Amino acid sequence: MLLKLESDTEHDLSIAFMLTFRCNYDCSYCESHDVNHPLNNKPPKSISDALNYVTSFYQNKSIIINILGGEPFLYKNIFNMFNNLEERIDIKVTTNLSFTLDFIKKTFNNTKINIKASFHPEYADPYEFVKKVKYLQQNNFNITSNISMHPNKSHFEKAIYILENLPRSKPHILSNMSVNGLIFGDSFSYSPSQIKTIKKYSGSLKKYIKCTYPDNIKYVTHQDLISKNLDNFKG
């Protein structure tokens, strides 16, 4: 069983903050959401004040806060929260980018925000997704894309379209929902040709993750971590 995961980072401190469990998608393979979870209605300043307080213990350190969900942009005051965070804090937000391009044009004006856009083929339109990502790239946002590789033929083809049209995107191997008390079940059953395709688009991913087990330490790629079911923690 896996005891600990460690990955290289450009920051001295990385904080993962779950802004909301609520999501407008209900993907069959996702455990990090609840379509019925109450929306976060806390004042934005109370959230940013709490995050500023935590980071105040790490003066002269480089810090990034990763805003997670659910879907973080369901929190209507998210931009006010961003604006109240101290300047020294870098911000990354993981989003399914399901809002309209018009919404992006009207509201996205803080290029300090790093965006990790995730494509989910059970719900998202690949053509609209590409349009939104390209618009943000053209307007100087630092945006990367994680593309969920569902083995269903139609879903897989949607993912390939995005990987072909967004050079900074990368494939994300999926796991089934948890079984037998493990965090994840086995990875989906991909055909040999699908595995070959995933490897093709994973060629530029050289980042390794340090995995600590009871009897040894391994350095594995993110793709191997998921596809070979190495991500089941003890407990």
What residue spans do the PLM features occupy?
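A short acidic (Asp/Glu
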Residues: K76-F79, F103-K105, H155-A159
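A short, N-terminal amphipathic alpha-helix
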Residues: A50-Y58
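Radical SAM enzyme [4Fe-4S]-AdoMet core and its adjacent flexible, acidic
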Residues: S118-G235
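Core AdoMet radical
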Residues: D34-K45, N60-Y75, E86-L101, N110-F129, ...
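N-terminal [4Fe-4S]-dependent radical SAM core
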Residues: M1-A16, Q223-G235
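Acidic (Asp/Glu)-rich catalytic clusters
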Residues: F57-Y58, F82-E86, I104-K112, K131-N140, ...
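Canonical Radical SAM [4Fe-4S] cluster-binding loop centered on the CxxxCxxC motif
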Residues: E6-I47
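Conserved N-terminal glycine/acidic-rich loop preference
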Residues: L3-H11, S28-Y29, F108, K132, ...
